[in-house]
Amino acid sequence: MHARLTSKSAFPAAGVAAGLLFVTWFAAFHIGVVQRADQSILQGFSDIGQRNGIRPVANFVANLCSPEPYLYFAWIPMLVAVMRGRPRVALAIAVILLGANLTTHLLKPLLAEPRPAWLLHGVAQIGAASWPSGHATAAMSFALCAVLASPARLRPLVAAVGAAFAVAVCYSFLALAWHYPSDVLGGFLVATTWTLLAVGALLALPQRQPAVPSVSKTATWRALGPSAAAVIGAGGLAVLVAVARPHAVVSFARSHEVFVLGAAAIALVALALATGLMLAVRR
């Protein structure tokens, strides 16, 4: 039996996401071991960002989700939904994009508080109003909306590409030391909460055709193919880098063990959210 998101399950799931958002905030601001991990992961990203040629690329990618550039492409999922004759889906996407990004904008000053930085070296002080990350919210909300807007047969691929986009944006601004890693998770969860709320409302409406088109004809293992390929590709790239510069990679990994785990966790969370939505709306 294929998993399926319904209005009755979407709203509790949104509540769980909101609860995890609170837990993430509390841990990032009030639990010492999490704060130390936050700093260690950020230090690793910052050290990579200091290497030749990294900063220009990171600046370009990170700024894709700055307000002005974002407006140039954020509307694409809505346009796709309208062109596919799904005006309600287009409206839900508009609600997700506006609601998620506005929520993050309001939470930043409300929860602003300086965080300890005793483990950071060569990293400029990050502003108190950094949680949750607006760039992470924008990137993940766009990725999730792209999943909802895309044709059923393309949704697995769109989920993998959308997750890769969100990871690229977040890795980039972390390399530039704009945010703590916990800010990224906060942004992801804001986007997820709004997506679940909007999809729940969409599914609760009476309709003659599925609010979110079916992909039931695609076997689960085939639907997971693009996401699995993304994981394998990332692993293969890591192996190639390690083979090309074994001593440098091993030395860096040994001195940044928490960073390695944190970077992998961010990527897996992004992929899990996009892929999970893709599977959850299957009929």
Sequence positions of predicted segments:
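N-terminal transmembrane-helix/juxtamembrane module of multi-pass inner/ER membrane proteins
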Residues: 1-73, 108-124, 257-264, 275-283
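Hydrophobic alpha-helical transmembrane segments
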Residues: 8-20, 36-45, 104-109, 129-138, ...
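Interfacial segments of alpha-helical transmembrane regions
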Residues: 8-16, 79-100
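Alpha-helical transmembrane segments
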Residues: 12-22, 99, 228-236
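Transmembrane helix-loop junctions in multipass membrane proteins, especially transporters and channels
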Residues: 33, 86, 109-117, 156, ...
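Structural signal for the C-terminal ends of transmembrane alpha-helices
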Residues: 79-87, 146-153, 200-206, 275-282
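Membrane-embedded catalytic cores of phosphoryl/pyrophosphoryl-handling enzymes
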Residues: 120-266
